[in-house]
Amino acid sequence: MTNNTLYQVAKLGKPHSLRGFQYINIDNFFRRFDLSNISMQVGNEELIVENFKTHLKDRNLIKFKDFDTIESIERLRDKVVSISDKYKNDFLNDSKLPWPGFFINKNLGKSDLVLLGFNFSQNFTFCEVSNLTDFPIPYNDKFFSYQNNQLILIN
């Protein structure tokens, strides 16, 4: 991951079972995807996800390869998890848009508008855009498009 930019997407929680799973508090955007076999940066280590699954209504569990005991995963507890921008095109929402976190503080297409942030509310993602801060913009294909690795605000 050395040539790619890393983005914080989660924080690891306590161990869940004897089989190496632990809770992960991950950004809502990623909760519905199968993250198995991708690499993630955990603290200073690059780890491969062996299994990622939903637990109960709004919780997720993760298991990293070669982490099979409570002792081994306990040392990962409370560590920040980051994902590389090399996965930008691999995880797209129903509107074919990537995770908006990849575009924070970047221009939206060729405009002077900049994505300042985003938040998740009741199954919807809303974006805050410079010069339009009074109106959160829904993150969907009616307002945004994704072309040539650029996020574009549709006028």
Kindly give the residue locations of the regions a language model identified.
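Short Lys/Arg-rich amphipathic alpha-helical segments
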Residues: M1-N155
